[in-house]
Amino acid sequence: PEDLELAWNILKGPDKNDRRTPPVRWKIPEQRTMSDYKVAWVPGWKDYETSEQTKQVIQKFIQVIKDQGGNTQQLIPKEDLHRRTLELHQRLSFMTIMQDLPWFVKPLMVKGLKNGYLKGAENIVWKFKDTFSDYSQLIGQRMQIIKEWETYFDDFDLLVCPSGFGPAYKRCKIGTPITYEGKTIKYIDYVYPYNACFNASGHPAISIPLGLGKEGLPVGVQVVGSYWSEPDLLHFAKLVSKHTEGFVKHKPYPI
């Protein structure tokens, strides 16, 4: 966490020559202890469950928080908020990728995505509009979704959730299905659904490494906060790192 904190301190706030963006008065959380945090957690998301090992890793992490005096509660956001945020990311991503491309290039881009990163993906709207009006409508939806997430965080400081279906996986060709615990997962569904939603809403998140799993592969959790909670996330990560394994280098695979 100290390395991340250093990077964040360098990057945070507007450039000194930017006169249009006011500086944020960041809250300083140094005096907070684990007992000052109220933490929500989920073992997975609707339509995107996780492996048994991932659930166990999350539960073990929550127990660490409890043991240090933290307040925890399992609570999934209402109204399919995760699903709608994920759909927003999909539409905004496509609009960003396709903007300003000649009309004859767009089908080639779609074909490349279908045969690569998004191979086998379901519920993808391949035909979409990319006018300024459509973009403005999406931004309006994004503002509403951000509001709903912020309402959720009114009752909690942080949210602990999965960072993927299972542990880190062996490097493979993009689009190759990944099998873990006897279940084969589409390449896009192994990590994307658990992280992209917060990229869409813009909520700060941090990945906390928790050592190695039963196969000797890295495991961890994702912790998300409300807007402007970066100092709290970093402070929480430093507190909890004293009671977890943290990053452990795994043995390299034979070539």
State the predicted function of each range.
Residues 148-151, 186-208:
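Small-aliphatic-rich amphipathic alpha-helix that forms the alpha element of a beta-alpha
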Residues 33-42, 91-150, 162-167, 171, ...:
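Short helix-loop capping/hinge segments that flank enzyme active sites or metal/cofactor-binding pockets
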Residues 19-25, 139-147, 187-188:
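Short gly/ser/thr-rich secondary-structure transition/capping motifs
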Residues 1-11, 200, 204-211, 215-220:
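Short glycine/serine-rich loop segments
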Residues 1-56, 244-255:
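A short helix-breaking turn/cap at a secondary-structure junction
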Residues 52-77, 105-111, 135-156:
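Acyltransferase
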Residues 217-226, 233-234:
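Short, well-ordered beta-strand elements
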Residues 169-191:
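Short, surface-exposed loop/helix-turn segments at secondary-structure junctions
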